[in-house]
Amino acid sequence: MKLGGNDGMFDTALSMNPTMPLYDDKGNYYQPSSPTGARNPVAELKDIDNNGQRLYVLGTAEAKLNILRSEKQTLNTSLSYSLHYNDLKQQYFTPSTSGESYWNGYKGRAEVTYQKWYTQRLEWLVNYALDVQNHSIKAVAGYTYENAHWERLQASNNDFAYDNIKWHDLGSGSYLTDGKAQMATGQSASKLIGTFGRINYNWKKLLMASASIRYEGSTKFGKNHKWGAFPSASIAWEIANMDFMKNASKVVKSLKPRISYGVTGRSDFDSYLSLATYSTKGSYLMNGEWVKGYAPSVNANPELGWEKSLSVNIGVDFVLWNRLRGSIDWFDRQSKDLLYNYTAPQPPFVYNNILVNVGTTQNRGIELSIDGDIFKGTKVEWTSGINYSYGTTKLKVLSNNMYQASYVELYQKPGVGTSEYFFRVQEGGKVGQFYGYEYAGVEDGKMLIYTDEGEKVPVSEADAKYKRYIGNGTPTSFLSWNNTLRYKNFDLSIFFRGAFGFDIFNMRRYGMGLQGAGTDNVLRDAYLKDKNIVTGGGVISSFFLEKGDYFKLENVTLGYNFTPKPNKILNSMRVFVSAKNLFTLTGYSGNDPSIVSVNGLTPGVDSNSAYPTATQLSLGLTLRFK
């Protein structure tokens, strides 16, 4: 499996000065005039070898036993085992002609990495069902055991006699002889045990209720909080089946208000965060010999526990005239006991920070889903559906009596020696807010920003106290629109989607949008739209923020269904042509805004190395055999 040269080469090709040659006078690849300059992308892609071989095994086995089966009752049990196994070998080599070798003064670098990880899961289930007159009960109980393991070995060496040696003779590089070769190993393991039960009740198809409890324990947590209980419950009422709704039965086919509450636990992070771990800390001379030293690197926290997600949902489902279907939901989702590093007193703690459960975020909003048969029972049938959601996420809690923090800074700006962060979140504030300087115009070629007192100063006089919230990378609403049309044997599907109410930090404009970008390539706007601004980049400011709203035609598929003559082999045949990413309506000047990540705590930062979205055309054939 060829992994390619370097993931950042697309950005490098864009930013490289277009007047620079690919080769020098001697026929070798041209290298930049400084080690911080843009690397030669052709040299990086053609000369660097980055290969990998992966073995992936997915296996499952299950045994079922029917204990009781009658007209009114059923009882069965099952035992299942699954294995997910990955074995990865990676080999990397950069030759003596590469920019890395040129600027670091060695002849090539080779690296070999081996990784193996697997997850074993054993699950036992017992299912029971009872139907008596107007009552229907379904219950399930179970036990889960999960074992996960990961291990890694990495070794690298530099300065080889010949480039064609690559990684095949890793020990021949001079760095091993000089004691500068690198080697690293690591492994982790975790176990999870869970028991659970769930019961569903249905009375006359009028009242539906469900309740469940899951009790889980994980080795990842502190000794005092390894176990967690996660309950859930829901209830729904089918009003359309009530006697007083009979007169409206031709119109109202279903009207079901419902409410649900649930708690889930999160444990998908590193295995040893609750333990005091050790790492190497230099070498020390003992009895005439140098001995590698070890010291604590993380404080232990026996109180480290589960992150919990609490969800309340109130909604209603409806079906009208047997052709209009939909649902309306209000939701309140809270994530509690979120992990964060806080300042720890010394003593008693060895390190000055500790990972603890403190934070709480809250996501509230509404969701609307409607689809209907616009044309039904006619030559042309058309079904159309719209999904819309609106919501905001806030940081509700960041501190408690023991651990205090006034704000959290997230996503450090890339670059050497930088200390700026794109985001700041404080208690009561929205998640995903950009924090930086407010653009105030230009003067004598210098970008200006506002001070905390509203004055205008050059970026060179920027002070951290001038920063403010300048935008938000999280969309306030999402919209999707799906359409399906049928005419005789033809079918056509058209899908749109969009996001609204958010900003994107244009990293390409930040890096290449001003004339003062040095010897790098720059955007055309640097000499046209923004021609008056020569300097002032390098800081996070609203100048580089743009509205990210978009609405795009995501997919169009046209198909034709053939009806084969009676035969013993073929049941049906369908041919189709499909197109993806046909167009996007947006005011954003950077990459396709739909591929910019807008989820999580650090949304709305565009990537320099993201490839442009391509329009894809495909032709397909579907055959169904008897």
Region roles according to the model:
Residues 1-92, 105-418, 485-488, 545-626:
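Extracellular/periplasmic, surface-exposed regions of secreted and cell-surface proteins
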Residues 477:
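Metal-cofactor-binding active-site regions of metalloenzymes
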Residues 94-96:
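Membrane-interface helix-loop junction between the first two transmembrane segments
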